[in-house]
């Protein structure tokens, strides 16, 4: 089978969570980033006439120049620009919809390495753009790329965009208001900010609502975001909590842009997004906040979560991976709670428009305070099916159905496992990876089939 070369730029910029890539390389080279800003600015000026865009960023060393290039592109289309500086992704979403901005842009690659970066766009309502709108913007970006002179895109601009501290404080105040009146004085929490965007916000929230907070990984260098810390490595905080001999009630870890959170209980056991969905769903149902008695999870959520929710009279629906797609399903069904195993949780009863790691942490603490129980006690009946995830680096994202050996391995696994397991094989929307996820009652069969499928992918399109 001949495979398409990856040397030439592919005209497909947006993945499941905006545009991502290696900073400095297409599509995150200065020329293309400028064109992205110009295309978005032109679209907004046509729609709003006097358009203003809010830009926020994480702590990667490339985030400054990408923000500047975007700002120059926007301003070249006569679109106004404001900056929130280093701030979380959900912070930009909140401020965009509450402060009258025409759109919000986040410069971040979330959990990716520091060498990567990305661009996420929110509409004036604080929601991520639909796939259809992203496709329209792509066409405009390529038009501007062809029209622009490279010298214009690489012109001079400010050394950095000054961030507005008032904007960050407004967002922090909203977060605090979500748990107003709750007594958190008995909680002692370890917070891992991943040397990322949470470093600029978390200290404005947790201590001020009464949580005894110890912060770690809050000294970003531009190159240490997500490095052996945060939600990408929750075992680090979990180990610290477990060895603290009761000093901490739980650990909380954020990823680079703090749109998700993972936890560890007082014994140092890692608690993922599935468990958070379970405890939040039960609490919301008891208070009459769980509309339709429904939770929206994804294809990656464990079968054990579905069983535990069913025992509580709660229906679970599965959406495609990506909090954007979870939100779409929530809107369709009227659900007020949804999320991913990775820790993206959406609380529609808090009027949130995207996953928010800090809000999730506050809501979990609120459930603990309300119930008087520990995190471990609240999720004790969650019996997780054995699950394995294998990541395979690929040189091209060929549709699986066009890879006969891979399809044969998948079909063999599905036939062997039957109703006692699940097989999900998909490409990452943000990296050049194929992900193989298998759940099964039999760990031996699970690992056997995961290895067979991963090897078939590696042989067909692996790097």
Swiss-Prot record:
Post-translational modification: Activated by phosphorylation.
NCBIfam families, per the entry: glmM (TIGR01455)
HAMAP family to which the protein is assigned, alphabetical: GlmM_B
CDD domains xrefs: GlmM
Taxonomic source organism: Koribacter versatilis (strain Ellin345)
UniProt enzyme class: isomerase
Protein name: Phosphoglucosamine mutase
Cofactor(s) demanded: Mg(2+)
GO molecular function: magnesium ion binding; phosphoglucosamine mutase activity; phosphomannomutase activity
Swiss-Prot/TrEMBL catalytic activity: alpha-D-glucosamine 1-phosphate = D-glucosamine 6-phosphate
Keyword presence, Protease: no
Active site, renumbered: 110
Cofactor note: Binds 1 Mg(2+) ion per subunit.
InterPro entries tied to this protein: A-D-PHexomutase_a/b/a-I, A-D-PHexomutase_a/b/a-I/II/III, A-D-PHexomutase_a/b/a-II, A-D-PHexomutase_a/b/a-III, A-D-PHexomutase_C, A-D-PHexomutase_C_sf, A-D-PHexomutase_CS, Alpha-D-phosphohexomutase_SF
Keyword annotations: Isomerase, Magnesium, Metal-binding, Phosphoprotein
């Amino acid at each position: 089978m001949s495979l398409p070369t990856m040397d030439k730029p592919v005209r497909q910029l947006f993945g499941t969570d905006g545009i991502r890539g290696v900073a400095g390389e297409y599509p995150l080279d200065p020329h293309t980033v400028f064109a992205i800003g110009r295309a978005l600015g032109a679209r907004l000026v046509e729609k709003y006439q006097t358009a203003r865009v809010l830009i926020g960023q994480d702590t990667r060393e490339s985030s400054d120049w990408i923000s500047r290039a975007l700002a120059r592109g926007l301003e070249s289309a006569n679109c106004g620009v404001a900056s929130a500086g280093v701030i979380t992704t959900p912070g930009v979403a909140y401020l965009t919809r509450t402060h009258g901005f025409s759109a919000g842009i986040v410069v971040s690659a979330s959990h990716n390495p520091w060498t990567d970066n990305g661009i996420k766009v929110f509409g004036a309502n604080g929601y991520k753009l639909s796939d259809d709108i992203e496709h329209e913007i792509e066409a405009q970006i390529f038009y501007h790329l062809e029209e622009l002179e490279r010298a214009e895109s690489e012109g001079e601009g400010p050394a950095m965009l000054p961030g507005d501290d008032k904007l960050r404080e407004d967002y922090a105040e909203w977060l605090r208001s979500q748990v107003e009146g709750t007594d958190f004085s008995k909680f002692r929490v370890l917070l891992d900010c991943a040397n990322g965007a949470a470093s600029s916000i978390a200290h404005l929230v947790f201590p001020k609502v009464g949580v005894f907070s110890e912060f770690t990984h809050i000294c970003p260098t531009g190159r240490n975001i997500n490095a052996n810390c945060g939600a990408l490595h929750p075992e680090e905080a979990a180990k610290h909590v477990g060895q603290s001999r009761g000093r901490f009630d739980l650990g909380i870890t954020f990823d680079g842009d703090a749109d998700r959170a993972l936890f560890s209980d007082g014994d140092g056991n890692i608690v993922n997004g599935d468990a958070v969905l379970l405890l939040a769903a039960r609490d919301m149902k008891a208070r009459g906040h769980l509309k339709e008695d429904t939770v929206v999870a994804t294809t990656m959520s464990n079968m054990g979560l579905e069983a535990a929710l069913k025992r509580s009279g709660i229906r679970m629906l599965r959406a495609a991976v990506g909090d954007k797609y979870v939100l779409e399903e929530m809107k369709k069904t009227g659900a007020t709670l949804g999320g991913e195993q990775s820790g993206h949780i959406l609380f529609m009863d808090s009027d949130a428009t995207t996953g928010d790691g800090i809000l999730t942490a506050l809501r979990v603490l609120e459930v603990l305070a309300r119930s008087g129980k520990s995190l471990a006690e609240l999720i004790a009946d969650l019996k997780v099916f054995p699950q394995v995830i294998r990541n395979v680096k690929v040189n091209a994202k060929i549709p699986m159905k066009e890879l006969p050996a891979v399809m044969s391995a998948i079909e063999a696994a599905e036939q062997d496992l039957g109703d006692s397991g699940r097989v999900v094989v998909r490409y990452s929307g943000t990296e050049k990876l194929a992900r193989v996820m298998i759940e099964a009652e039999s760990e031996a069969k699970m690992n056997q089939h995961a290895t067979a499928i991963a090897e078939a992918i590696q042989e067909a399109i692996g790097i």
